[in-house]
Amino acid sequence: EGAGSGFDLGHQGLQLTMRMADGRLPDHPLRLQIWNQMGCDSHAAVKARVVQQDFGTADFAALAPLVVEAAAKNCPGAEEIVQGSAAALSRCISTVAQQLSLRSPLVVCHGGAVTHLQGFRTAVQQAIHQSIPEARWGKAKGDACDGALLMAEALTLRPR
C-alpha cells in the first residue's frame, strides 16, 4: 500500500484530473496545473505520457505538491485524496501501536510527503490525534537504519 507517499498522492491526483476531463467530476484548475507540469494538453496526451519509459514514480510524486495545495484551497477531490491518504497512514500507525500495546506512542514520520508537504503533514497529525489522542509527534534523529541499530544495541546490552 502506498498510503502517505508522494507517488500515491500524485497518482490519485492524476486520476482525479482524468475524471474531471471526461465529465465525471466538475473541472478545476488543478487539472490544468497537473497536465501542464506533465507537458500535456489533452486526455489522450496524458494517457500517452504515463506509459512512456521515462515517466515513473518520481514523476507521479512530483505532482503531489499540486494536489496538497489544491486541497488547501478547498478542491473537493484533492481534499478527499489528502484526507484519505492521511487516514490510511494513521490506521497503519494505530494498528502498530495497538499490536505493541503502546498507549502514548512517539510517532516519527521521516521523509517523503510527510516531511516535505506541510499541508499533508498537518492532515496526518490530525488523523493520528483522532485515532490515538495520546500519541506524541517527534522528530527523527536519524533514518530507519539508525533506529534499527539503536534497537539492536539495546537488545545486546540488556542483561540476560
For the regions a protein language model found, what residue spans apply to each?
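ATP-binding/phosphotransfer module of carbohydrate and carboxylate kinases, centering on a glycine-rich
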Residues: 14-160
